[in-house]
Amino acid sequence: MANNNQKAAPVEEQQVTKTEAFFEKYQKAIIGGVVAVIVIIVGVILFNNYYLQPRADKASTELAKSQELFDQQQYDKALVGFQQVAADYSSTDAGNLAQLYIGICQANLGKWQEAVNALEQFSGKGDQMISPAAEGALGNAYANLNQLDKAVEHLKKAAKMADNNSLSPTFLIQAGEMLESQGKKDEALKLYQEVKEKYFQSMQYQSIDKYIERASN
């Protein structure tokens, strides 16, 4: 029994080393990719069109003040405002949106557990952009906590929710790379093949063959 444990330990250590090497190589892309998507979507589309609350509404007005700080990348100051909106207007759309902003702020500040906590509380509306982007951000937050199984689960869910050329390939490739880092090449290959077969009008389609080739070897 002791010998079996001793044999298992090096395997586990090798897996941890491979995972660390993966994040060392891809961390900037993992952190930046989805967060950038969310910032663009939230800033340009969501606040003006998705929630459709009057600017005179107090909750929306308070949210807008924090959004200005967010747009200036003053995430620590914006975070305080969003947390206040979430606390004061928890039952409103503005309060719900504040949770998403809180999660993104925490991610930008490198506070990944806090980001997870906030993003878990955000309630999507079944759309094909904001809700899956938030789900993808949650997956990335879990990845940065080295909880890769949960990360892959949420990224795959995000890709399915979006089912479009803009977001799905990004999430599928991220999930695939994480699976590769765990030695699960067969599972990763399926995700890459899904990008090739379903999202041939996406930007990622141009480079998907290299992922397929890597996972096939």
Locations of regions flagged by a protein language model:
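Short solvent-exposed coil/turn linkers within tandem alpha-helical repeat scaffolds
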Residues: 53, 86-95, 124-132, 159-168, ...
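N-terminal positive-inside, membrane-proximal cytosolic segments immediately preceding the first
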Residues: 1-36
